[in-house]
Regions:
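C-terminal binding/interaction regions
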Residues: 113-115, 122-126, 131-165
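Short, polar loop motifs at secondary-structure junctions
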Residues: 14-17, 120-124
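Active-site neighborhoods of divalent-metal-dependent phosphate/nucleic-acid chemistry enzymes
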Residues: 72-123
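Helix-adjacent hinge/juxtasegments
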Residues: 51-77
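Short glycine/serine- and small hydrophobic-enriched flexible loop segments
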Residues: 42-49, 105-106
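Alpha-helical elements of the RecA-like P-loop NTPase motor core of helicases
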Residues: 12, 42, 83, 125-126
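Short, well-structured N-terminal submotif of metal-dependent ribonuclease cores
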Residues: 1-38, 47-59, 143-148, 153-158, ...
Length: 165
């Protein structure tokens, strides 16, 4: 199964908030918008600014974000994606969600890639399902792939451990 990763799922894996997704890393290929790096870094920067994480944890999470981005096919935000994001969608999504949806539609139309969407964002999921995309969080038959596990807070070296999911 190919998946399109949204930052909400990456952040959940990285921060250990909520239940971790059992399908993490168990995909044939993963795609994400170039927005993923920015969205994840901004979320971590916000936690740091609010004093919820220290400098060491911020650096460790930043490294993990880069590792995830290097393991995923990052799709550039092109003019055609931005144009498509401005077109009507089946539900009210807002700008960033529209860009994510347009990215999935571009992957499908221009490259023949049919992704299931991995997101914790209900509005994004609802719109994606209206467009015919499957919810990756509900899919169980997947092929294992090596993806990094989230950095443990107690890991003093700050190294991410690779995990064969």
């Amino acid at each position: 199964m190919d998946v399109y990763l949204d930052s909400t799922v990456v952040l959940r894996q990285m921060l250990g908030s909520g239940n971790s997704w059992d399908g993490w890393g168990k995909w044939e290929k993963a795609y994400a918008s170039m927005l993923l790096r920015t969205e994840c870094n901004q979320a971590v920067n916000r936690l740091h600014a609010e004093g919820k994480i220290d400098d060491v944890r911020r650096a460790r999470l930043g490294s993990w974000i880069e590792t995830v981005c290097s393991c995923v096919t990052m799709v550039p935000v092109t003019e055609s994606i931005l144009r498509r994001a401005g077109e009507p969608l089946p539900t009210d999504t807002g700008v960033l969600r529209s860009i994510h949806l347009a990215t999935m539609l571009e992957l499908q139309a221009a490259h023949g890639v049919n992704c299931a969407v991995a997101t914790d964002d209900d509005k994004l999921l609802r719109a994606a399902e209206c467009l015919g995309f499957e919810n990756a969080l509900n899919v169980t038959s997947v092929t294992p792939e090596v993806m990094p596990e989230a950095p443990a807070e107690e890991n003093p070296e700050g190294k991410s451990k690779g995990k064969k999911a």
